[in-house]
Regions:
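Class I S-adenosyl-L-methionine
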Residues: 1-122, 241-252, 260-262, 266-349
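Helix N-cap and loop-to-helix transition residues
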Residues: 16, 123, 137, 212-215, ...
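SAM-dependent nucleic-acid methyltransferase catalytic core
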Residues: 68-83, 139-254, 258-269, 283
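SAM cofactor-binding core of SAM-dependent methyltransferases
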Residues: 90, 96-170, 207-208, 212-213
């Protein structure tokens, strides 16, 4: 397997410098990426003369081991674990099936390296978004997104065209709604959040993000990986999972629930889905205790402290059950506010 990779490409090609950089950095040992810009003179006639400068880009990376490459979801999901995949992977233990109970953007599941993955999210629309990256041909998906952007004149910060595109989607009958259409609209929304009203109409306001080269690189690499994985998709209240899945059959359970101390689109009102509060948090603790009693290994990602407020119920529960507790330090979320995240394990490492 190649360890050192060089790529020569010029600025007349179809791929942008930013796109190539995003792709290569995904596979690069940290700090190894380099790019040299080499100007050159291209043959010119009277039609092409003085149109633009010409460059040859020479890219270099030292390639990571395959099991160290991190694939990021194209969905900018609130509470995404994309930035803390390494410590999560370091503390996983062997099993045949990995169950991502609160699947969200699927950043953890797609990087977990288990034989069989089970994705679950109570939000059936989010489940459809994630499964769409497996179900559609990636090239066709990208062309659909680009055509929808062009047809509806979508651009970052353009409120008028965004609201019109959003209304177009919301007013379609359910059998005419294409999940790729929703994905495209989300890309131009505020912080690319996934928010719906009680009628399941998408209602996030316009934002200043767009379908850029970074999103494109994530879409391509994530779609390739999810097509290669053996994934089962579910959309259930997690409490019902033991009735559907035999969790005792060589499974590892990963839980990344909403955070009680933070405000996301999942807990500032139910918005057609289940919210999150003290009662539901205690229900979660009991669910994990039940897994522990059956010797089913599980990992919980959660927030211990945020804006000076500590989750004492979480702390007491960890100590009472003698669970393993791993601090991850301050994590900066979408809001820009740091939060103290932890991993809780019901097994020894």
């Amino acid at each position: 397997t190649a360890r050192h990779i060089f790529l020569s490409y010029n600025n007349d090609g179809d791929m942008s410098k930013d796109f190539i950089e995003a792709i290569m950095k995904r596979y690069a040992v940290d700090g190894s990426f380099e790019c040299i810009t080499i100007p050159y003179k291209k043959y010119e006639n009277w039609k092409s003369k003085n149109k633009k400068e010409h460059f040859e880009y020479l890219f270099y990376i030292e390639k990571k081991a395959n099991n160290e490459v991190i694939y990021e979801s194209p969905l900018n999901y609130i509470g995404s674990k994309a930035k803390i995949i390494p410590p999560i992977k370091q503390n996983l233990i062997p099993a045949n099936t990995f169950i991502d109970v609160f699947g969200g953007g699927f950043n953890v599941g797609i990087n977990s390296n288990y034989n069989h993955l089970i994705y679950n999210d109570i939000n059936f629309i989010v489940k459809e978004l994630i499964s769409s990256f497996r179900d559609y041909d990636t090239y066709d998906y990208i062309m659909y997104v680009k055509k929808f952007i062009e047809k509806h004149d979508l651009e970052k910060g353009n409120k008028e065209t965004y609201i019109a595109a959003r209304a177009y989607y919301n007013n379609l009958p359910d059998n005419k709604k294409d999940i790729r259409m929703l994905f495209t609209i989300i890309l131009y929304s505020f912080q690319q959040q996934i928010r719906f009203n009680s009628n399941f109409e998408y209602n996030n306001p316009v934002g200043v993000r767009w379908f850029n080269d970074c999103i494109l690189s994530k879409l391509i690499s994530f779609s390739r990986m999810i097509k290669e994985c053996d994934v089962t998709f579910l959309s259930l209240d997690y409490i019902k999972l033991p009735k559907v899945i035999d969790l005792t059959n060589n499974c590892f359970v990963y839980l990344d629930p909403p955070y009680k101390l933070t405000t996301g689109s999942y807990n500032d009102g139910k918005r057609g889905f289940k919210g999150w509060d003290d009662k539901l948090e205690l229900e979660l603790f009991q669910f994990i205790d039940n897994l522990t009693a059956q010797n089913i290994p599980c990992m919980l990602s959660y927030v211990l402290e945020h804006k000076g407020e500590k989750n004492t119920a979480l702390e007491d529960w960890i100590n009472r059950n003698n669970y393993t507790y791993i601090p991850l330090g301050d994590i900066i979320g979408i809001s820009g506010q740091p939060r103290k995240e932890i991993l809780v394990l019901n097994y020894d490492i």
